[in-house]
């Protein structure tokens, strides 16, 4: 009996192994046949039937998957117009099969067709770098770079304060008390919303953004905080203009047509300058007898050496950015490391614009302008009538008397068509002066959706 039982056990084991061997050899064929049927149904446009057959095929495959089945599932989602599932499947396949270029292209095309600018902004730069020869991705990238909105705001005047703040005069004048015409200016943030409006004819925001010199409708200047609480005034002096209060407590001021420095109590330093700028990072530029010097607040009274023929002042009213300044001596223009007192590079330029950021700066060669890195290397050959240094990856350039915008690849993203413009703000907003002389907005979609 024991022998019979042992023989039966052996037969059962052999049978089980035989069954497993049979299934292991027939399952791949069954799966391939089922997948082929699903593909045929998809190609014939029977997407629901294709989904049913694919599900059956996947059940034969078990927990494992293949690129072929995942790609078919992706395409069935698109055929069924299930765009959320289609997008998710593309993102998943990019993670699982990073070497398969087609999924990157399909995802970019999906975002482009749906005008999903945030989606494009989140992937295009990386995908162009990863697949530089993919024409579809490159074409969509270029088109997206040129995409912008135009808004007619019709402001009378706009001044650049920083990459997140502008000073605006909305109308030539407004009627005040007794219907007396008044000039009124206010500060707008990068998205165009008012952040400070004291009903004054002039505003000068401090370096740290916590206080403001304001000039009322009678021409009286005072220093106030953001809640309009009085910080300082000087009734003994009639200022014609006041600059930006530095974190060192010093600002440039004009009285009787002469430039001086004042402190946070609005007391005037007697020394007069041919020209000067506001303090930033503790440094300002002062001019005497046609020559310039870089000074700290404690050196304003004592400085006697003026080694530079020029010091470039940027649109914020400063001569220094991230410890660097653009200066000129007898050899030409160069970028100076202020802390070390040494040039950042050996070569010299005929002219350099001021640094607006740590990004490339505009240089002149002959009658044309191009762009150079802060280490002196040429980024773009001189080809424009005029140019401004880069901010936020974009720069204003002038051709045929009109201004447009180029990106970091020197691609003309906004064709020259405006009388003037300010630098590109953090939000992607740019203020441009139209043919009638008023200021409108354009919004660069790529920069707007960057974050």
Locations of the language-model features?
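Hydrophobic membrane-insertion alpha-helices, especially the h-region
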Residues: 5-20
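Positively charged n-region of N-terminal signal peptides that target proteins for export
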Residues: 1-4, 24
């Amino acid at each position: 009996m024991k022998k019979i039982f042992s023989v039966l056990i052996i037969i059962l084991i052999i049978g089980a192994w035989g069954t497993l061997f049979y299934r292991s050899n027939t399952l791949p064929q069954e799966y391939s046949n089922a997948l082929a049927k699903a593909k045929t149904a998809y190609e014939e446009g029977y997407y629901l039937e294709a989904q049913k057959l694919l599900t059956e095929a996947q059940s034969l495959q078990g927990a494992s998957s293949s690129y072929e089945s995942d790609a078919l599932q992706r395409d069935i989602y698109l055929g069924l117009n299930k765009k959320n599932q289609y997008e998710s499947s593309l993102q998943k396949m990019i993670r699982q099969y990073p070497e398969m270029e087609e999924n990157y292209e399909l995802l970019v095309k999906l975002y482009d067709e749906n005008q999903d600018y945030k989606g494009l902004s989140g992937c295009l730069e990386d995908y162009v770098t990863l697949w530089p020869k993919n024409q579809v991705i490159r074409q969509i990238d270029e088109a997206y770079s040129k995409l912008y909105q135009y808004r007619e705001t019709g402001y009378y005047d706009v001044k650049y304060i920083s990459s997140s703040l502008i000073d605006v005069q909305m109308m030539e004048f407004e009627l005040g008390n007794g219907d007396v015409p008044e000039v009124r200016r206010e500060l707008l943030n990068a998205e165009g919303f008012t952040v400070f409006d004291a009903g004054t004819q002039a505003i000068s925001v401090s370096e740290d953004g916590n206080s403001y010199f304001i000039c009322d409708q009678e021409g009286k200047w005072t220093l106030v905080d953001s809640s309009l609480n009085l910080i300082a005034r000087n009734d003994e002096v009639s200022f014609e203009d006041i600059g930006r209060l530095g974190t060192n407590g010093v600002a440039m001021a004009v009285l009787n047509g002469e430039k001086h420095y004042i402190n946070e109590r609005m007391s005037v330093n007697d020394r007069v300058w041919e020209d000067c700028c506001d303090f930033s990072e503790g440094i300002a530029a002062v001019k005497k007898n046609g020559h310039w010097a870089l000074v700290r607040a404690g050196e304003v009274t004592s400085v006697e050496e003026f080694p530079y023929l020029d010091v470039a002042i940027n649109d914020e009213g400063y001569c220094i950015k991230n410890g660097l300044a653009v200066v000129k001596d007898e050899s030409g223009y160069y970028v100076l490391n202020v802390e070390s007192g040494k040039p950042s590079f050996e070569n010299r330029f005929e002219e350099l614009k001021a640094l607006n950021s740590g990004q490339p700066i505009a240089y002149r060669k002959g009658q044309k302008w191009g762009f150079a890195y802060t280490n002196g290397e040429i980024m773009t050959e001189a080809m424009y009538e005029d140019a401004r240094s880069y901010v936020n990856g974009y720069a204003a350039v002038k051709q045929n008397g009109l201004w447009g915008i180029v990106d970091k690849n020197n691609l003309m993203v906004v064709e020259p068509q405006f009388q003037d413009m300010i630098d590109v703000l953090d939000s992607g907003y740019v203020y441009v002066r139209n043919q009638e002389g008023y200021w409108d907005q354009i919004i660069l979609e790529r920069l707007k959706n960057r974050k």
